[in-house]
Amino acid sequence: MQIDKLRGKELDQLFNSILSLKDLEECYRFFDDLCTINEIQSLAQRLEVARMLREGNTYHKIETETGASTATISRVKRCLNYGNDAYEMALDRVKETETESSSK
């Protein structure tokens, strides 16, 4: 994994801080303090690009709907094809949570 080069106390602290957040509102507050609006939007955009790629959408449609560049779309697609399956894991879990919430 590329991130292995960064492993250490500071990154562990960051990830453990994120894992400690209890709900969506705490996430909004934490990321508002931690990141710029553009950084948050970029992260959210990449996740949406991954979701759309998994659904089989074209680069053109993804670019039009998300504003992502073809370079970003290609980078996300490369991660989907050759990465650590983390996009799939996260998107599957979000989908499960949404399904559980809608069935209540």
UniProtKB/Swiss-Prot annotation:
One of its GO terms (molecular function) is sequence-specific DNA binding. SUPFAM superfamilies: TrpR-like (SSF48295). Gene3D superfamilies: TrpR-like (1.10.1270.10). It comes from the Bacteria. InterPro entries: Trp_repress, Trp_repressor/repl_initiator, TrpR-like_sf, YecD_YerC. This is Uncharacterized protein YerC. The lineage of its organism: Bacteria, Bacillati, Bacillota, Bacilli, Bacillales.
